[in-house]
Amino acid sequence: MPIKIPADLPAYSVLSDEGVMVMSPDQAARQDIRPIKIGLLNLMPKKIQTENQFARLIGATPLQIEFSLIRMTEHQTKNTAAAHMEEFYRPFQEVRDEKFDGLIITGAPIEHLPFEDVTYWQELCEVFEWTQTNVHSTFGVCWGGMAMINYFHGVRKHMLDHKAFGCFRHQNLQPTSPYLRGFSDDFVIPVSRWTEMSQSEIDAAPGLTTLLGSADVGPCLVEDKAHRALYIFNHFEYDSDTLKQEYDRDVASGTEINVPINYYPDDDPSQRPLNRWRSHAHLLYGNWVSEIYQTTPYDVERIGLDTTDLRA
């Protein structure tokens, strides 16, 4: 939560420059409280696992969150019971007239396909356009983030020679970003992908700022202020055993796979993996929800119309 201090107090500008969340009494007086409405467009095969992962992170804040599960309209999932989808999910076409404070677009295990060859690509492009009028802040994750940054900026995804798989060290490139409050300078994030985005292409796209990056696996978290979006290519939301499940699955099927880097103690798969990213995962998603709370209109119907920043 923000600290409320007079705008003319020297600490106000000092803390603001350091990225600390501060709010003047006048700003606080203009800010009412209501539930934050966040949607999850779930493109992953294991729907329930993914729901739990993201709900755990955004539900850990002191704010009340209204969490809505959304699916692509025509795409039929094969890995989750139809009864579950019918009871808890709504198709995009059913929610497109609603407004959301936040939207998370998950990854999908289809990174080997060109974006245009994905069966639901046309509707997903409709979602991207819809976020500009109906969503205050959008968070694209892994393939979902790559798809968004490609759609809005033409940044391409590139196939890797070998799967980036494991827990890789990352660096905090923008310590004063409100999304990185409390972040260490150096930390690990789970990575599991066959594709990457080029830092040079991101740098060449107007309006993009890389917040987190890795010398080993490239850019990780990118801010797109013009489209009120964040794009993350790695997996802070992963459970402690998610990489283990992926590794065990591939070993059992005979698929060639390396032991995930820097995940098991001594890189020994017989040992229990250590979770060394959980605290930063909560920081990132908590900061995202907090930033939504600070900047979204009180009247949900003003989302996409009201560009006033309550901190201005």
From Swiss-Prot:
GO terms for cellular component: cytoplasm. Its EC number is 2.3.1.31. GO terms for biological process: L-methionine biosynthetic process from homoserine via O-succinyl-L-homoserine and cystathionine. The record marks E111 as: Important for acyl-CoA specificity. Pfam families: HTS (PF04204). It comes from the Bacteria. The active site is at C142 (acyl-thioester intermediate), H235 (proton acceptor), E237. Keywords: Acyltransferase, Amino-acid biosynthesis, Cytoplasm, Methionine biosynthesis, Transferase. The record marks S192 as: Important for substrate specificity. Substrate binds at K163, S192, R249. One of its GO terms (molecular function) is homoserine O-succinyltransferase activity. It is found in: Cytoplasm. CDD domains: GATase1_HTS. It is an enzyme of class 2 (transferase). Pathway: Amino-acid biosynthesis; L-methionine biosynthesis via de novo pathway; O-acetyl-L-homoserine from L-homoserine: step 1/1. It catalyses: L-homoserine + acetyl-CoA = O-acetyl-L-homoserine + CoA. Belongs to the MetA family. Transfers an acetyl group from acetyl-CoA to L-homoserine, forming acetyl-L-homoserine. NCBIfam families: metA. This is Homoserine O-acetyltransferase. It comes from Ruegeria sp. (strain TM1040).
